[in-house]
């Protein structure tokens, strides 16, 4: 990721309109800001959320609240709790997420 031509700024995530995205189960609420080619999101997964697709996009993901389980295409499963993060490159390792109890995440991609 290369960040160019971005002046100092702040974001009040409570003021960013949320969009709702249905999963195979449950839903995800995204609050999204774009800064050039960089997408920054505050995500909220409902309890019982399960992604409806495998994702090949690279991310930096930080779990703020709740618990997130990420399954990789090779069968590995990673569980994040608050304060834990993961990072993955574009087109590197397909992954999909679920959350039994719900989760709040901060994602940069």
Where on the chain are the PLM-derived regions?
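Short, surface-exposed secondary-structure edge patches
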Residues: 60, 75-79
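A generic structural signal for residues embedded in beta-strands
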Residues: 71, 88-89
